[in-house]
């Protein structure tokens, strides 16, 4: 009996092993395609997903997987199509079936495309880093293991600025969107003057616009008198015509123009503001009326500057989206850890108590000195996790995305990854990027980042969006550290001296350091500084 049990156990083990082996799918063998890409549902997204997969399989193996539709699937095929509701919008399921097929099903929108990206990245060794910058290992045979992988994005909308977005594959790879993808006529922020242009309505109807210092003031940056019923009627007429021109799109922004303390202070508006404890109350009352008038549409509005804090009483309807902006916050530590950030966190937590439809516009950019060091990599993950925790469903990270900006490629890489999954290891993301993008120079540039980060925190000097290198000349950009940074860049360049592509990337990444040196060098030396130096010398 004991031998029988051992024999049965061995048979079960062999069966399990054989099942595991048979669950593998070979796409290419000895340079020849052995699989097909089958479109279960023929639509634009699935076709784009199929083409992306076909393209990269060919780059890896030189073999072309045929794309077919309206045909019976067979063993070894990759099936693109089908619904996986649990994955959510843009999510997907990769699953090896009992018929030895790989099913890529979608939770909606671009889920099938993102499923292909995950397949290429996680199981076929393709890594994408920046515009037209990727790595792969050529293979004559491509075999996939048994797969069961479901992913749901942390946010339904993910956006960042980057020159890399000019590469259509990059944009898909990092699962990024643009306002034009979501918002009707690209109307996603500061839209009051687009909906009711003051040039058109201001002369005849000045009462539509903010009452400030005793008079209504039409203008490109003026706000609306939100308690005036004629403003609501005029806005409805304008919006109705916009919706009819774009019947297939759902979302639009009805939001204040840029500028602070420009909201209407007529007696009626002021009364609502005082009752609600914030000018946002007027906005939400107005937006709720629009949301009731057009229940099949979604309206986004700003919680920005004067309207950042939530109202005390009125609650946004489910189809009212709150775009909350943290423009006034410092960036050297996470938002939860500095005074300016705490005001924003208070607002975020307040909005999250009355809405689960929040869009956060976060800033990681230096507007005044765009080509200068901005070492905020250590706060990215904590801030994005904070947003996720507080019912944020849409996220825009406004960063310096220009070529030659402060590690702009790495910043976009990390943000793209973290907006999809905020609970990845951020330091591992940095190391992975550096190793893939900078090659043998990576250790030196990693040291550069960590030394500058530590110096920033030790200096006590805030990092903000209107910063200057000069303000850090006694801190993270002091002469001793500048010497260290340059030595690290020298070592980085030497490490890849024989590779012109990698060398060029390092030289571009050095520009912010060089810019800082030039800015600091042209700083006037004050008389007080000279006297202090003379005193120390004597």
Please identify what each model-predicted range represents.
Residues 447-468, 472:
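Long, charge-rich alpha-helical interaction segments
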Residues 66-88:
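Short, well-ordered secondary-structure micro-motifs within conserved domains or adaptor modules
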């Amino acid at each position: 009996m004991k031998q029988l049990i051992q024999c049965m156990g061995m048979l079960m083990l062999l069966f399990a092993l054989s099942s595991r082996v048979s669950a593998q799918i070979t796409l290419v063998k000895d340079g020849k395609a052995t699989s097909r890409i089958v479109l279960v549902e023929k639509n634009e997204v699935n076709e784009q997903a199929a083409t992306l997969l076909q393209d990269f399989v060919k780059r890896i193996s030189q073999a072309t997987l045929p794309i077919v539709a309206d045909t019976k699937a067979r063993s070894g095929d990759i099936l693109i199509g089908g619904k996986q509701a649990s994955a959510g919008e843009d999510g997907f399921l990769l699953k090896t079936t009992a018929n030895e097929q790989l099913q890529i099903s979608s939770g909606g929108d671009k889920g099938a495309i993102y499923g292909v990206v995950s397949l290429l990245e996680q199981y076929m060794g393709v890594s994408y880093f920046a515009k037209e910058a990727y790595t792969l290992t050529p293979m004559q045979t491509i075999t996939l293991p048994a797969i069961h992988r479901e992913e749901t994005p942390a946010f339904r909308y993910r956006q960042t600025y980057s020159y890399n977005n000019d590469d259509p594959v990059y944009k898909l790879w990092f699962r990024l969107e643009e306002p034009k993808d979501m918002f009707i006529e690209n109307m996603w922020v500061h839209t009051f003057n687009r909906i009711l242009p003051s040039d058109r309505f201001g002369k005849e109807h000045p009462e539509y616009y903010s009452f400030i210092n005793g008079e209504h003031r039409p203008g490109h940056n003026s706000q609306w008198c939100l308690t005036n019923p004629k403003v609501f009627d005029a806005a409805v007429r304008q919006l109705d015509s916009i919706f009819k021109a774009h019947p297939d799109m759902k979302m639009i922004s009805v939001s204040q123009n840029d500028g602070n303390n420009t909201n209407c202070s007529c007696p009626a508006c002021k009364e609502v503001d005082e009752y609600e404890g914030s000018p946002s109350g007027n906005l939400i009352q107005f937006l709720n009326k629009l949301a009731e008038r057009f229940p099949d549409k979604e309206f986004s509005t700003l919680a920005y500057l004067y309207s950042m804090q939530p109202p005390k009483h009125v609650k946004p309807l489910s189809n009212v989206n709150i775009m909350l902006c943290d423009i006034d916050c410092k960036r050297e530590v996470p938002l939860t850890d500095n005074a300016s950030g705490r005001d924003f966190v208070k607002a975020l937590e307040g909005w999250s108590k009355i809405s689960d439809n929040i869009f956060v516009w976060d800033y990681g950019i230096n507007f005044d000195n765009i080509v200068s060091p901005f070492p905020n990599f250590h706060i990215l993950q904590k801030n994005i996790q904070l947003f996720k925790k507080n019912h944020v469903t849409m996220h825009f990270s406004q960063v310096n995305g220009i070529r030659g900006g402060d590690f702009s490629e790495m910043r976009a890489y990390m943000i793209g990854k973290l907006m999809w999954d905020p609970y990845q290891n951020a330091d591992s993301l940095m190391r992975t990027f550096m190793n893939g993008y900078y090659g043998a120079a990576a250790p030196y540039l990693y040291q550069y980042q960590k030394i500058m980060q530590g110096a920033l925190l030790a200096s006590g000097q805030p990092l903000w969006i209107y910063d200057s290198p000069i303000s850090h000349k006694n801190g993270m950009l002091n002469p001793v550290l500048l010497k260290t940074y340059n030595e690290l860049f020298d070592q980085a360049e030497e490490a890849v001296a024989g590779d012109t592509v990698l060398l060029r990337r390092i030289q571009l990444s050095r520009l912010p350091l060089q810019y800082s040196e030039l800015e600091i060098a042209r700083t006037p030396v004050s008389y007080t500084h000279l006297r202090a130096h003379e005193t120390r010398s004597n």
